[in-house]
């Protein structure tokens, strides 16, 4: 127990010390220095920060749970991100950096006017502050509690354990985001990302070795053989078109999921802000493309362990006892069974770092958007950089404090995570098409985003209320089918407005913020990534190991 605590503290403190050292000479009293790390992030740091912004503890448990409950089809969330990260690198980022974009709403204002900027800024800041932050804290605390049994160790109730964890995570994460700015967040993300890859990849290898030992008396190789031969359909990444959640129907890989990923990876502020802080277009493209490769191998620690847990004999009693909640306990049970005690402290620190990264990334983005898109636009247009940094710190402190107070009580709001995911879809495509107005639909009138938003909210709201079902199975239709249909409809509307109601063509201004020379190897590396993704889907298919 002492060794676990010491190794946990060592890694956690090491991350904090390195982050403080790397930001010791930064100018955090300017808006660009505080909110965009002085536009000085290299590609490797951008890649690590993008990865950790996306990867939450809830995702680690939830996606593995999906693999346990269905098959390998949830790898679509990981492998599919490769293509949208390439889109960010090749098409979105050059325009963002050319315009000197700090926040996505700033681009919206340049293209469609102040009203559009304020509308989306207000909605996004409210969602980040009221919904995302408390849920990130709560879900992270619950995952940590489920894996490491904090309540059992200290003899306290689960609610108390979750509340304490929320306070600890909130305070530490808030310190990174509020006092260190974006660079401190990005540096800590990079170190935690390295730890996560090491710790995360350790789990399937240990699990396969234990599977081989428990089933045949062998080791790792026997575990792999058993996994492939025992139930091959569990290794199939191609779910039927009418598969129920948590499986991912195969048509959505190319439609709804791709469009959803375009929003998250290419237009969502908490993700894109890391790339906007690049020291050059070359480094920004490297970061996005590197992250694409990291996401492609993500299924090794985000889906495969769940499939292994389905087969591992020693944890089946625990999962059976969990009943309907077994999907959320598959990964914690596997970790408890396979991670050696001397390594558990390191793994706990890695998981703690992933939770911190999710929280401080969203907190930093909420603070950035509130300050630059609401305060400086609507409240105090003449605010100096120093005033903006001060307001950003005050808002970040208040938002963090509210999240800490609210987070433990999310326990009593059933289905809050599903509700949060559903709410994000109400703004995903409208934001995406507003940004596309600066990239593709350059003649669309200024009222176009409002038309798209109205159509999307009404149509998606109707889908959520009616909850249509598949005619074949009677199961609810996957929400990404609705996103796929709405993307086509809204694209057609935007095309019509651009073609027949268009105004003078918009030309993005070049403000000379950074060097816009692209990475010369970007195309060949992207082609290699696409070949890798195709190879993975062939491997996990009926013509591969899922025969």
Segments the model singles out, each with a brief description of its role:
Residues 1, 38-39, 45, 62-76, ...:
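Loop-to-helix junctions at membrane interfaces in multi-pass transport proteins
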Residues 1-60, 180, 205:
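Membrane-interface "cap" regions at the ends of multi-pass membrane proteins
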Residues 2-5, 65-78, 135-165, 183-192, ...:
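Transmembrane helix-loop boundary segments of multi-pass membrane transporters
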Residues 15, 51, 73-178, 256-264, ...:
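Helix-loop-helix module between adjacent transmembrane segments
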Residues 26, 470-547:
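Terminal cytosolic tails of multi-pass membrane transporters
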Residues 32, 101-105, 109, 116, ...:
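Hydrophobic, small-residue-rich membrane helices and short re-entrant helix-turn-helix hairpins
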Residues 114-118, 129, 159-167, 371-414, ...:
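Loop-to-transmembrane helix boundary motifs in multi-pass membrane proteins
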Residues 196, 448-460:
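Central hydrophobic cores of alpha-helical transmembrane segments
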């Amino acid at each position: 127990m002492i060794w676990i605590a010491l190794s946990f503290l060592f890694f956690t403190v090491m991350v904090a010390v390195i982050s403080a050292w790397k930001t010791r000479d930064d100018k955090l009293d300017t808006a660009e220095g505080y909110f965009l790390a002085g536009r000085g992030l290299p590609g490797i740091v951008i890649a690590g920060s993008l990865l950790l912004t996306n990867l939450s503890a809830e995702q680690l448990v939830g996606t593995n749970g999906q693999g346990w409950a269905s098959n390998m089809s949830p790898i679509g969330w990981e492998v599919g991100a490769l293509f949208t990260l390439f889109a960010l690198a090749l098409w979105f980022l050059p325009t963002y950096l050319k315009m000197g974009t700090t926040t996505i709403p700033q681009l919206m204002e340049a293209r469609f006017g102040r009203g559009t900027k304020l509308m989306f800024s207000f909605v996004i800041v409210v969602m980040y502050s009221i919904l995302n932050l408390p849920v990130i804290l709560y879900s992270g605390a619950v995952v940590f509690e489920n894996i490491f049994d904090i309540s059992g160790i200290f003899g306290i109730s689960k609610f108390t354990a979750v509340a304490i964890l929320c306070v600890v995570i909130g305070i530490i994460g808030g310190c990174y985001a509020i006092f260190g700015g974006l660079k401190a967040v990005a540096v800590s993300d990079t170190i935690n990302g390295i730890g996560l890859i090491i710790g995360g990849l350790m789990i399937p290898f240990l699990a396969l070795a234990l599977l081989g030992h428990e089933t045949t008396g062998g080791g790792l190789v026997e575990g792999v053989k058993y996994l492939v031969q025992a139930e091959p359909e569990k290794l199939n990444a191609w779910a039927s078109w009418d598969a129920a959640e948590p499986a991912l129907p195969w048509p959505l890989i190319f439609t709804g999921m791709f469009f959803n990923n375009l929003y998250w990876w290419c237009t969502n502020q908490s993700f894109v802000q890391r790339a906007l802080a690049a020291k050059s277009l070359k480094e920004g493209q490297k970061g996005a493309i590197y992250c694409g490769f990291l996401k492609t191998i993500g299924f090794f620690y985000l889906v495969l362990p769940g499939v292994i847990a389905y087969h591992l004999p020693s944890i089946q009693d625990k999962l059976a006892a969990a009943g309907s909640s077994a999907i959320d306990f598959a990964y914690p049970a596997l970790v408890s069974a396979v991670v050696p005690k001397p390594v558990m402290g390191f793994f706990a620190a890695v998981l703690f770092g992933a939770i911190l990264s999710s929280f401080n990334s969203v907190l930093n983005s909420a603070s950035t958007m509130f300050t630059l898109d609401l305060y400086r636009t609507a409240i105090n247009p003449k605010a100096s950089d120093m005033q903006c940094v001060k307001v950003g710190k005050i808002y970040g402190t208040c938002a963090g404090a509210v999240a800490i107070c609210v987070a433990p009580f999310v326990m009593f709001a059933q289905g809050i995570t599903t509700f949060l995911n559903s709410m994000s879809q109400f703004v995903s495509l409208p934001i995406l098409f507003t940004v596309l107005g600066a990239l593709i639909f350059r003649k669309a009138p200024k009222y176009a985003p409002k038309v798209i938003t109205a159509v999307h909210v009404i149509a998606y709201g109707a889908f959520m209320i009616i909850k249509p079902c598949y005619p074949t199975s009677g199961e609810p239709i996957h929400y990404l089918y609705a996103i796929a249909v709405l993307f086509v409809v809204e694209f057609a509307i935007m095309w019509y407005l651009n073609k027949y109601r268009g105004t003078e063509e918009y030309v993005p201004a070049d403000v000379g913020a950074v060097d816009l020379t692209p990475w010369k190897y970007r195309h060949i590396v992207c082609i290699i990534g696409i070949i890798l993704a195709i190879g993975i889907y062939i491997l996990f298919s009926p013509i591969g190991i899922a025969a």
